[in-house]
């Protein structure tokens, strides 16, 4: 008998509507081919600028409550110049949902969905080839959630970075879990600024002790964040494995990493509230790119969102095989030359989504 999985869909702003529609199209193809296994129930709600326009707040209570009751959340993108940098901003909805749902771990893979895309990387193919790591970013602590003071006319503003041992232990265990999913286990790289920051010294000490005491079979190496940023351009495969870092450093380094495969439109992400040890962790899934307000309709690449849906199947919905099928379908479509303009292709958003859904049906036939 089919199990019903409830997915809250938060399209958000601008291209968010288009990309979530394509991901749903691919998920529906899974459902069509596995009618006895799964039934997806999609529950749409507002977030970001769209929510501000309709309700005055970036995350309405009903969207948050629905998300808490769901099996997983699929997010499009939030933000845009229309809403500026005023007191109420679209991005506040994203920060709030992360905090309220305790989505403490952000996972952002960086690899090539297909080797046929190597020539699109800003790095030389011989440098970029083989890049394969996951950034595990602590998502609900650090400077983004610390105490702060705005400039109130006195010309002074400040933000504070604070981490506790339990917070660092929790994200370290997530990185260790991800490393142990491979045989042999992947190496772990911990990025910090321990030569300057007290919070980074606590971070480094806690990561080191947690791995040593709880995961002695794993290796962890510490790298200063500025040095890691240089390595990422000069020799990205040196950092292959699992990269663990704090909220702000993770935000920056994962964006730097995201250009290596040639387009932000290729990279998925997952934000988890617990270890996915039974493939049923609650999570929010979204592409790494933003809302692209200047992009004409039909031009956005839906692959990142489709691959985010694949991560959702594998980590939250206990449909690991089906998640891998979506990844295979994406590779098949990209290799066939069906691509959006960011990948030097001529296909529309819906054409790429249609092609992936068709490939899924063929692979599951």
Swiss-Prot record:
Disulfide bonds: none annotated. Substrate binds at residues 98, 108, 137, 226. GO terms for molecular function: 3-isopropylmalate dehydrogenase activity; magnesium ion binding; NAD binding. It is an enzyme of class 1 (oxidoreductase). It is found in: Cytoplasm. Pfam families: Iso_dh. NCBIfam families: leuB (TIGR00169). Homodimer. Catalyzes the oxidation of 3-carboxy-2-hydroxy-4-methylpentanoate (3-isopropylmalate) to 3-carboxy-4-methyl-2-oxopentanoate. The product decarboxylates to 4-methyl-2 oxopentanoate. This is 3-isopropylmalate dehydrogenase.
């Amino acid at each position: 008998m089919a199990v019903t999985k409830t997915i809250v869909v938060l399209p958000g702003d601008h291209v968010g509507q288009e990309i979530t529609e394509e991901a749903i199209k691919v998920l529906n193809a899974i459902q069509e081919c596995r009618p006895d296994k799964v039934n997806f129930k999609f529950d749409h709600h507002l977030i970001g600028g769209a929510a501000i326009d309709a309700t005055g707040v970036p995350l309405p209570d009903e969207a948050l409550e629905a998300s808490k009751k769901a099996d997983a959340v699929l997010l499009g993108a939030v933000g845009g110049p229309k809403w500026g940098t005023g007191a109420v901003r679209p991005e506040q909805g994203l920060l709030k949902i992360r905090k309220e749902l305790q989505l403490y771990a952000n996972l952002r893979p960086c690899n090539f969905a297909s080797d046929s895309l190597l020539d699109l990387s800003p790095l030389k193919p011989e440098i970029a080839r083989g890049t394969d790591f996951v950034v595990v970013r602590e998502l609900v602590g650090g400077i983004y959630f610390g105490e702060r003071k705005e400039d109130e006319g006195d010309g002074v503003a400040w933000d504070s970075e604070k981490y506790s041992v339990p917070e660092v232990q929790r994200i370290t265990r997530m990185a260790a879990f991800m490393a142990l999913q491979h045989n042999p286990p992947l190496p772990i790289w911990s990025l910090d600024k321990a030569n300057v920051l007290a919070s980074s010294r606590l971070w480094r000490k806690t990561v080191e002790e947690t791995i040593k005491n709880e995961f002695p079979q794993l290796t962890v190496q510490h790298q200063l964040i500025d040095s890691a940023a240089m390595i990422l351009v000069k020799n990205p495969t040196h950092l292959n494995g699992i990269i663990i870092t704090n909220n702000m450093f993770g935000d920056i380094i994962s964006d730097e990493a995201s250009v290596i495969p040639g387009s932000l439109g290729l990279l998925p992400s997952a934000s988890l509230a617990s270890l996915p040890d039974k493939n049923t962790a609650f999570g929010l899934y979204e592409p790494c790119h933003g809302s692209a307000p200047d992009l004409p309709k039909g031009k956005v690449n839906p692959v990142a969102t489709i691959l985010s849906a694949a991560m959702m199947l594998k980590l939250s919905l206990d449909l690991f095989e089906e998640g891998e099928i979506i990844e295979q379908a994406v590779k098949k479509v990209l290799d066939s030359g069906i691509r959006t303009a960011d990948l030097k292709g001529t296909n529309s958003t819906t054409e790429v989504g249609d092609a992936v859904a068709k490939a899924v049906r063929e692979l599951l036939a």
